[in-house]
Amino acid sequence: MVSISLKNKTILITGSAGFIGSSLVLAVLRTVSPVTVIGIDSMNDYYDVSIKEWRLKEIEKEAGKHPEAVYRFIRGNIADRETVQVVFSEYAPDIVVNLAAQAGVRYSITNP
């Protein structure tokens, strides 16, 4: 088993407003200090956006409990090259966890 320290790292988590992504953001904020977590999500409407907004509010509340943790959210699509370049240029993440997905089955049928 490989052990990697996340302390003092900048972690980019894509799909951070989704179920798995938001759970990972919360877990990192609760267990690693100091740390910087950059979340990015397109906030698409493949399912109810209010659920994603609620998750982001929960993350903000949790981040507020950890003064040595930095959390930033970016509304953006990782399919957009310029967005990704800006994120990497501005935050220079040490670790990237790609949990972004196109969750909408109907959309994927009409736009394969």
PLM regions with names:
Residues 1-112:
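N-terminal Rossmann-like NAD(P)+-binding domain of SDR-like oxidoreductases, especially those catalyzing
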